[in-house]
């Protein structure tokens, strides 16, 4: 019997009904959307529309036509960053970012785009006011993650959004570790765009992601991918209207069906339900670590974190610790988590950490089992 504590990588198990919904599409529907008008094609199109509307409800977003399906979180960020930024532009990120943000920016840097990082402290906590000295006349974008995939620390995105609004700077949110886990209000945060994967806190399958863009920002983003949309087929130009402009090619419809089932479950339960559950388990985990000779990388303040817990087995090799945990049935992720800048900020580079990430299906028994295993390795 294993204990799955790698929900920061992907959720498991998926929400009830996800597999069945995907199988229903494959076995009983099978049609593409925007290509034909027969019954099964219309059925699939209605599921896509319903899923866009579900995402509007989840994130308090107004327009389902500006909800874009992507292959995943990384694809969404690439579409936004590479479609918006140009040579001479400056963008502000944080020192906690994942490589899904940083690698596109490193590529763009070679083309004349500059970036600065909001510094976080050794607990992964950043202050919104530290963005102010970084703003330049050519600052065209602020793009940050909502919560660290390494240590779970939350960035002060509401305050950052307010600063961006005051200065008319577009603001992009990477919600990879918070969508489905933590309440997100597109309007309240003053977002220009939001990206999220379908397979983490949204409890859907891999291979499907979402990108929400407000009307003004969408007009400034050039599509990264061009091709067939099933619409405006008399022209070799991309259609000017949404969502078609950003959805060239064949849609991952099985993925959307799975995501639709997952969102139905999340909306029925409410995000606050999942947040409360993970807060309770995270606090239990943090309390249990206090008498074990390991280092917690990240804050103990539950108001400033999510259920991603980074443990440094000081005096031990973290990779060996992760292997020992696996032998005891505790499934985690060890290493640098595609976020070297975050580890440098936390003081855990290059050794990395062992990451325990909780999910909706995690239990107190899972937490206690993990703590017992950590204790046996660390002593």
Feature annotation, model-predicted:
Residues 1-379:
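Pyridoxal 5′-phosphate
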């Amino acid at each position: 019997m294993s204990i799955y504590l790698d929900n920061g990588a992907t959720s498991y198990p998926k929400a009830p009904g996800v597999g069945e919904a995907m199988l229903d599409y494959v076995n009983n529907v099978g049609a593409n959307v925007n290509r034909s008008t027969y019954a099964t094609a219309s059925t699939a199109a209605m599921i896509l529309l319903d899923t866009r509307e579900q995402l509007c409800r989840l994130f308090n977003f107004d327009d389902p036509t500006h909800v874009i399906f992507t292959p995943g979180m990384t694809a969404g960020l690439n579409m936004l960053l590479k479609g918006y930024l140009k040579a001479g532009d400056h963008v502000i990120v944080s020192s906690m970012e994942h490589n899904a943000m940083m690698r596109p920016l490193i590529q763009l840097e070679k083309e004349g785009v500059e970036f600065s990082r909001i510094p976080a402290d050794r607990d992964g906590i950043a202050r919104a006011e530290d963005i102010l000295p970084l703003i330049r006349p050519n600052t065209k974008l602020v793009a940050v993650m909502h919560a660290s995939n390494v240590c779970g620390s939350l960035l002060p995105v509401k305050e950052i959004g307010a600063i961006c609004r005051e200065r008319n700077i577009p603001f992009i949110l990477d919600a990879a570790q918070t969508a489905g886990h933590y309440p997100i209000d597109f309007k309240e945060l003053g977002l220009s765009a939001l990206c999220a994967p379908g397979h983490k806190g949204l409890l859907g399958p891999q291979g499907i992601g979402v990108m929400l863009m407000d009307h003004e920002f969408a007009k400034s983003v050039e599509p990264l991918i061009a091709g067939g949309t099933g619409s405006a087929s008399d022209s070799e130009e991309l259609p000017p209207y949404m969502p078609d402009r950003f959805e060239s090619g064949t849609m991952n419809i099985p993925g959307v069906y799975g995501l639709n089932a997952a969102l139905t479950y999340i909306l029925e339960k409410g995000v606050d339900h999942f947040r409360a559950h993970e807060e309770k388990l995270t606090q239990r985990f943090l309390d249990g670590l206090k008498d074990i000779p390991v280092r917690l990388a990240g804050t103990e303040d539950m108001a400033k974190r999510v259920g991603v817990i980074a443990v440094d087995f000081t005096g031990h090799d973290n990779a060996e610790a992760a292997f020992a945990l696996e032998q005891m049935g505790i499934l985690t992720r060890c290493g640098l988590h595609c976020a070297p800048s975050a580890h440098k900020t936390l003081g855990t580079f290059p050794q990395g950490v062992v990451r325990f990430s909780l999910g909706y299906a995690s239990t107190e028994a899972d937490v206690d089992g993990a703590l017992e295993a950590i204790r046996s390795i660390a002593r």
